[in-house]
């Protein structure tokens, strides 16, 4: 991979916190193929940027380890010269293009009124006159069109050359990129049954990743300074370092938002399935990029551990309450909360094959006893919800649970049976997938009893649609 990545950014973009996170990381890694074209016009929606910003951009960017080039953004020769210079750069580069917003507009040039509002028909006439532009709307002058076609032909030649190289190396490249997931998951399921151990689902995830990273070249892992807690780094990983990109694991530092944005970029590039870890409570720092993963239909996997009040000693600031409900409300996002090692394996399996849907794996810190002890070729977690226990053929109530609370639901079901109150327990690792099932299957799961109960160590909001108005929801609707 030797191509450049060009970023177009404005004044407002560089006020955002993610710009500091991402540029700091890029500078640290010396990403020489990264070039940012900064439209430096000193105007934002409210007015001049001086209302809110007095940064020394040159010092700021250079302190991150970036090269800085200042040019007149309206001078094509300066633009060309700067772009030529960055081709041999050893660092990421900012080309600060000093421009005037609304250029050519007699009444709105250099003003915030031209930022997000139409110029208006009368002002457009004045702009045409100012720029000596006599062509009809949407008419491309012949000279410009001719030059554009030349660029297209140049690109076509490069593409043809690349296709020829790919054709000659197709078998080798396809072998590198081929995912051998099916065999791995089949084996891991059998290992889980044979070992029959209690373990945290974050540990189950690590064991699954260990098997996947041993034989796979498409997974790019990482963590926001929590690798040892998220269990995202395996013994097979090689760390990506400055000037050494022949690796598959990124130490993102405490940069959750940038990590999520980088993973989106890796997925959009193609041939990679990125995953990154942090605590579930910090999913709020990742939220804008998680939403974009879903909106852009990218296969990005977020490993979110310490997923309930069972996380340990950190207290209410680190105990997720509303996070699961919020994440489950995002369209085209699969939020998985596995109950044991077998479910964790199946959740990973579904996440990796979801080419147009990102996934969140909500995992525990505390140990979970194995629940499913028989091998099944069927991925039950792909159904979103399934019956995991029934105390009698004819039952009185249905108990829904996810993750660490499934074992609690099973224990409660057995105790109720002693009092001749019979029930079935539904493990619901992914509400999003269950909602996509056929009506007949949903009726089978939901429609058997009038009395329904849900148990989850988090906000109860997202369970009410399953248990109904007469149901009971056991959860936590206050801070921990």
Q: What are the roles of these predicted feature ranges?
A:
Residues 1-6, 19-139, 146, 150-362, 367, ...:
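Thiamine diphosphate
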Residues 10, 71, 223, 277-278, ...:
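Small/polar loops that bind or transfer phosphate-bearing groups
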Residues 12, 72, 253-256, 279-280, ...:
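Short loop or secondary-structure boundary microenvironments that flank
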Residues 12-18:
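Short acidic, Gly/Ser-rich segments with clustered Asp/Glu that frequently serve as metal-coordination loops
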């Amino acid at each position: 991979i030797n191509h450049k990545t060009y970023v177009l950014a404005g004044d407002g973009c560089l006020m955002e916190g993610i710009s500091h996170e991402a540029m700091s990381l890029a500078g640290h890694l010396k990403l020489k193929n990264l070039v940012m074209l900064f439209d430096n016009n000193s105007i934002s929606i409210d007015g001049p940027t001086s209302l809110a910003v007095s940064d020394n951009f040159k010092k700021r960017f250079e302190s991150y380890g970036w090269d800085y080039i200042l040019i007149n953004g309206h001078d094509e020769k300066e633009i060309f010269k700067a772009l030529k210079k960055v081709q041999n750069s050893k660092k990421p580069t900012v080309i600060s293009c000093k421009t005037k917003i609304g250029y050519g507009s007699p009444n709105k040039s250099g003003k915030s009124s031209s930022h997000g509002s139409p110029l208006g028909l009368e002002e457009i006439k004045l702009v045409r006159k100012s720029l000596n532009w006599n062509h009809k709307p949407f008419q491309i002058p012949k000279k410009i069109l001719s030059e554009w076609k030349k660029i297209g032909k140049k690109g076509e030649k490069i593409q043809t050359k690349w296709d020829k190289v790919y054709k000659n190396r197709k078998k080798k490249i396809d072998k590198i990129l081929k995912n051998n997931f099916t065999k791995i998951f089949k084996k891991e399921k059998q290992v889980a049954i044979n070992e029959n151990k209690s373990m945290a689902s974050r540990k189950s995830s690590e064991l699954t990743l260990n098997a996947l990273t041993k034989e796979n070249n498409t997974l790019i892992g990482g963590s926001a300074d929590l690798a040892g807690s998220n269990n995202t780094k395996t013994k097979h990983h090689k760390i990506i370092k400055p000037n050494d990109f022949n690796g598959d694991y990124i130490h993102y530092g405490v940069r959750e938002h940038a990590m999520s944005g980088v993973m989106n970029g890796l997925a959009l590039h193609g041939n990679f399935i990125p995953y990154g870890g942090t605590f579930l409570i910090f999913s709020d720092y990742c939220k804008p990029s998680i939403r974009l993963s879903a909106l852009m239909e990218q296969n990005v996997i977020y490993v979110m551990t310490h997923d309930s009040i069972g996380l340990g000693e950190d207290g209410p600031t680190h105990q997720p309450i509303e996070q699961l409900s919020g994440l489950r409300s995002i369209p085209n996002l699969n939020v998985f909360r596995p109950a044991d090692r077998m479910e964790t394996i199946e959740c990973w399996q579904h996440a990796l094959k979801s080419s147009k849907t990102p996934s969140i794996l909500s995992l525990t810190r505390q140990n979970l006893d194995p629940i499913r002890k028989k091998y099944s070729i069927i991925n039950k977690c792909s159904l979103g919800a399934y019956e995991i226990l029934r105390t009698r053929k004819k039952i009185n109530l249905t108990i829904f649970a996810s993750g660490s609370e499934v074992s609690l639901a099973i224990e409660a079901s057995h105790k109720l049976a002693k009092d001749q109150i019979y029930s079935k327990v539904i493990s619901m690792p992914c509400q999003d997938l269950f909602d996509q099932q056929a009506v007949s299957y949903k009726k089978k799961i939901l429609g058997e009893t009038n009395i329904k109960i849900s148990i989850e160590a988090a906000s109860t909001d997202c369970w009410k649609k399953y248990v109904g108005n007469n149901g009971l929801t056991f959860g936590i609707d206050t801070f921990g």
